[in-house]
Amino acid sequence: MNERLIVKSFGPVNDLDIIFKKVTLFIGDQGTGKSCVAKLFSMFKWTEKVLSQKKYKLSYFEQYNRFKTKLCAYHRIESFIYENSYIKFEGNLYDFLYENGNFSVTEKNRDIKGISKVMYVPAERSIVSVAENKSKLLKELPDSSETFSDEFVNAKKFFQSGYNLPFEGLRFEYDSLN
C-alpha cells in the first residue's frame, strides 16, 4: 500500500507529509485537520478506483476546476483551497497533483491487482441510523453522508444473519433492537 499524501496550506493543514500503511491512525486535537486529511485520502482513492475502471478519463478531472467543484465539494472542503495550496497524492496506480490552481493526474502503468474500497465515514454518521427514513433531513447533510447512509443500509442487509469475523472465533450480528 504505502501511499503518500503531501498537503500544504489546505484548510487547517499547513504542512503535512504522510505515508499511509495498511492501518493509519490519526490522533490530535479537534480542528487540526484529521478529518480533512481522511477526506482527501478517501477522495483520491475513489478517483483512483474510477479511473482504473475506465469510468472516467484523466482529462475529466483535470478540466473545468473539477478538483474543487466536484471532488472537494463532495466532502464540503472546497473552501479549504487557498491560492498557495499544494496537494500531492502518490497512489498505487496514479499520482495526483494540485498546484497553482491546476489539477493533474499521471498514470503509473502498473498492473491492477484489486483496489480496496475506501470510504470516509462522516461525523454525521450517528444521524444516519436515526434518520434512515427521513429523506428530507438526510438531504441537508453532506453528500458523503448520503453515500454512508446507502452503505449502512446495504451492510445491515448483508449482515442480517450474522458474520464470522476472521479471528478468535468471534461472530458479528446486527440486532435492530439495540
Model regions and ranges:
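Phosphate-coordinating catalytic segments in nucleotide- and nucleic-acid-processing enzymes
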Residues: T47-N178
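Pre-Walker A-like glycine/lysine-rich segment at the N-terminus of P-loop NTPase domains
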Residues: M1-S42
